Amino acid sequence: QAQMSAKGIPQIAVVMGSCTAGGAYVPAMSDVTIIVKEQGTIFLAGPPLVKAATGEIVSAENLGGGEVHTRLSGVADYLAEDDPHALALARRAVASLNWDGGGVNHAVRASMAASYDEPLYDAAELLGIVPADTRQPYDIREVIMRVVDGSRFDEFKPRFGVTLVTGFAHLKGCPIG
């Protein structure tokens, strides 16, 4: 993992079962980690070892399931409903990498940016979304949807650190995020 990361090779982990002991490091060190709800688990030691060491009885889901790793620890970036959803999220992650492996030249990239979809929501609505009082909260996603191409925004880690919004989109055909 570390060597591939050092070479700039993106790593995407999809956890559809149990990642235990050394295998738990793979999703933790990946650039994007997707875990399947009530199916995928990530932990260094499973429930039997926890019981043997501490006497505590804990389920695999409560010890290292999707809820734990997408809301509390932040180890996983996306929570998938099932295996097909996990694979769809993985495909979306690949599409948003903005990594061409050296295969796309700048002329091709420029022509790709020449065409784009206008936002689905009117930018004039921004005045009604962003309050004049800078201390008053508002949903930044509403602003993003009125600025980015096709109002498409792929939020990264949507369940972790909910006061912070990060993600990927396109602006006039150019990838941002």
Regions found by a protein language model. Name each.
Residues 1-2, 104-115, 171-172, 177:
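Proteins with a high burden of low-complexity, intrinsically disordered sequence enriched in S/T/G/P/A and R
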Residues 1, 35-36, 42-45, 131-136, ...:
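Generic detector of short, locally flexible boundary/turn motifs and exposed helical patches
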Residues 18, 61-64, 112-115, 133, ...:
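Residue-level detector of functional hotspots within protein domains
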Residues 1-102:
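Conserved catalytic cores of soluble enzyme domains
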Residues 78-144:
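Terminal amphipathic helices with adjacent charged low-complexity linkers/tails
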Residues 136-177:
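Non-catalytic terminal/interface segments that mediate subunit docking, oligomerization
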Residues 11, 47, 53-57, 74, ...:
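Generic preference for well-ordered secondary structure
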